[in-house]
């Protein structure tokens, strides 16, 4: 088996409680593209791969032997405000409203699985 072309050298791997609901969230907020879902015999998600904003994220369903393990994620995007609004509308909690920073337009929210999403438009020039 060869490495999928959408893999990058480093990718986040989260363990979430309620992986099917997490999929609905990332599809609604980021228009995430499904690449792979492998299910356990009980139909829970053993492993999933999705493309978010051009990059791959990987995750699986939490279990007794695999407790939830969230991650901070950074997205370089030109639509900071739009993604922030979509995150909040889909149950995330804002912890940095969209604002202009010396490094670009930025915002942040925490999803209900404990993942921190940082949104940044690095090409923004505040001058």
Predicted features and spans:
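Conserved acetyl-CoA-binding loop of GNAT-fold acetyltransferases
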Residues: 28-35, 91-93
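Vicinal oxygen chelate
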Residues: 1-5, 9-17, 38, 46-51, 59, 62-88, 105-110, ...
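Residue-level marker of positions within ordered structural domains that often coincide
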Residues: 17, 31, 55
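N-terminal beta-strand motif that seeds the catalytic metal site of vicinal oxygen chelate
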Residues: 1-24, 35-36, 71-73, 120-127
């Amino acid at each position: 088996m060869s490495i999928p072309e959408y893999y990058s050298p480093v990718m986040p791997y989260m363990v979430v409680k309620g992986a099917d609901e997490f999929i609905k969230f990332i599809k609604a907020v980021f228009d995430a593209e499904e690449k792979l879902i492998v299910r356990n015999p009980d139909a829970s998600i053993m492993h999933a791969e999705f493309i978010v904003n051009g990059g791959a994220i990987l995750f699986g369903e939490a279990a007794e032997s695999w407790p939830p393990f969230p991650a901070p994620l950074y997205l370089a995007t030109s639509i900071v405000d739009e993604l922030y609004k979509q995150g909040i509308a889909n149950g995330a909690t804002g912890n940095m409203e969209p604002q202009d920073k010396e490094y670009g337009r930025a915002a942040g929210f925490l999803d209900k699985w404990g993942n921190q999403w940082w949104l940044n438009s690095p090409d923004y020039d505040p001058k």
